Design a protein with these regions (language model features):
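C-terminal regions of proteins
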Residues: 84-157, 161, 167-169
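Secreted/periplasmic serine-hydrolase-like ester/acetyl group-modifying domain
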Residues: 1-65, 151-170
């Protein structure tokens, strides 16, 4: 998870397995968002050095592992705007990295900010996350080649157990 890059093991908070979900949180609540335009104009600002630095580290790691990096922004009218889109687009273009911004696609995704927002437009709730996941899954299948994982039985069992637990919770 990207947030792990910014915290040392001494300061990191370890979440219990039941809320971790490998970076996802099941958020069933809903607080509607009044502002629905994710692409409002904003003041352009340069990409902060620390973000650029860690993106370079992530890129290097992906290359070393033979993986292709995809920068992704999920719908968030509270935290996203056209200026941020432009900055990330420029960085991705300069670095030859794919960038998928779902903010301009909220109508295609059928995001309803009255029902799909957990906290007034900052995060999606379960309903919104499922819509994004469906779209993202298709996007990845169409554009990237995935081979069967070579993980051991313990890893596969862990994912199967996680899926079972997730399905029970939702």
């Amino acid at each position: 998870r990207w947030k792990d890059l910014f915290f040392s093991p001494k300061t990191a908070v370890i979440l219990p397995d039941e809320v971790s979900w490998r970076g996802f949180e099941i958020r069933k609540g809903c607080r509607p968002c009044e502002r629905t335009d994710c692409m409002e104009a904003g003041e352009p600002q340069p990409l902060v050095f620390s973000i650029r630095h860690y993106l370079k580290k992530i890129q290097s790691f992906c290359r070393k592992e033979g993986s292709q990096l995809l920068l992704l922004s999920v719908p968030s009218p509270k935290n996203w705007n056209a200026a941020k889109h432009q900055i990330v687009s420029e960085y991705a273009r300069e670095e030859g990295i794919d960038f998928l911004d779902l903010n301009p696609l909220t109508q295609d995704l059928k995001i309803d900010w009255k029902t799909d927002s957990y906290d007034g437009g900052d995060h999606l709730n379960l309903s919104g996350a499922e819509k994004v996941t469906d779209y993202l899954g298709e996007y990845l299948k169409q554009r990237y080649h995935f081979s069967a994982p070579s993980a051991g039985a313990d890893v596969r069992d862990s994912w199967k157990a996680g899926l079972k637990e997730y399905l029970e919770q939702v």
